Regions:
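TPR/TPR-like alpha-solenoid helical repeat scaffolds
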Residues: 2-4, 172-176, 197-212
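Structural signature of tandem alpha-helical TPR/SEL1-like repeats
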Residues: 5-19, 41-53, 75-87, 108-121, ...
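N-terminal coiled-coil initiation/transition segments in long coiled-coil scaffolds
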Residues: 12, 16-23, 29-37
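Short coil loop/turn residues that delineate tetratricopeptide repeat
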Residues: 26, 60, 94, 128, ...
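Conserved alpha-helical positions within TPR/SEL1-like repeat arrays
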Residues: 29-40, 63-74, 97-107, 130-141, ...
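A generic tandem-repeat structural signature
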Residues: 58-125, 131
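Ankyrin-repeat and related helical/solenoid repeat scaffolds used for protein-protein interactions
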Residues: 130-192, 196
Length: 212
């Protein structure tokens, strides 16, 4: 499907949902769906308005809280994003997605221990949630806990062998652990899957292989 066709289809969906909102102004579901489609169309302010309306109608609408939090995270407002995800957890404490989001927020704030705690909680709730393992790998690498980073990365690759990001993160974790040959194999796999390998990392790995 062409980009033009996608825009036409989105415009059609938006028109239909706007009509539904006018007909059912108290429908949490319709406001939520319209917010998601606005976001997809790049109409961020409209998305914020509709998701906020959904939450106003139902302050326990966890999906609206999560999605509104994601918008604020993308905008760089991590405090608002954190507040919304924490509100979601008060409603549904075992919502793995919210724990992952809070981990991302903590990681952006350079609060690595807190990030690791949130990602770990997410993996306990949903053991095959690949995004949690991928992000946990990244946080453990930042903390220089290389053995644990490799373990987390292997979990991600086991769950989703064709995840380019999981392969890249495993390559990085193996590099810092000193397993350069296996790191190289995962770099090649990540590149094959379309991941844009950092040139500096690739060069550093080649230098290590040249001296090993």
């Amino acid at each position: 499907m062409s980009d033009t066709q996608k825009k036409i289809d989105l415009a059609t969906v938006i028109t239909e949902l706007e009509k539904a909102c006018a007909e059912k102004p108290d429908s949490v579901f319709v406001h939520h769906q319209l917010g998601l489609v606005y976001r997809q169309a790049g109409r961020v302010d409209d998305a914020v308005r509709e998701l906020s309306k959904a939450i106003e109608l139902d302050d326990q609408s966890v999906e609206s809280l999560i999605n509104l939090g994601a918008i604020f995270f993308d905008k760089g407002d991590v405090d608002r994003a954190l507040e919304l995800n924490e509100r979601a957890l008060k409603v549904t404490p075992n919502m793995a997605e919210a724990h992952v989001n809070i981990g991302l927020i903590r990681q952006r704030q350079n609060l690595i221990d807190e990030a690791i705690e949130s990602y770990t909680r997410a993996t306990q709730i949903i053991p095959d949630l690949v995004t949690a393992w991928i992000n946990l790998t990244s946080a453990l690498t930042m903390k220089e806990e290389d053995e644990k980073a490799v373990e987390a990365a292997r979990q991600a690759v086991t769950i989703e062998p064709d995840s380019a990001m999981a392969r890249n993160n495993l390559a990085v974790a193996l590099y810092f652990k000193g397993d350069f040959e296996e790191s190289k194999k995962n770099v090649e796999k990540a590149r094959e899957l379309g991941y844009p390998i950092d040139d500096r990392f690739a060069q550093a790995l080649e230098e290590k292989l040249g001296h090993s």
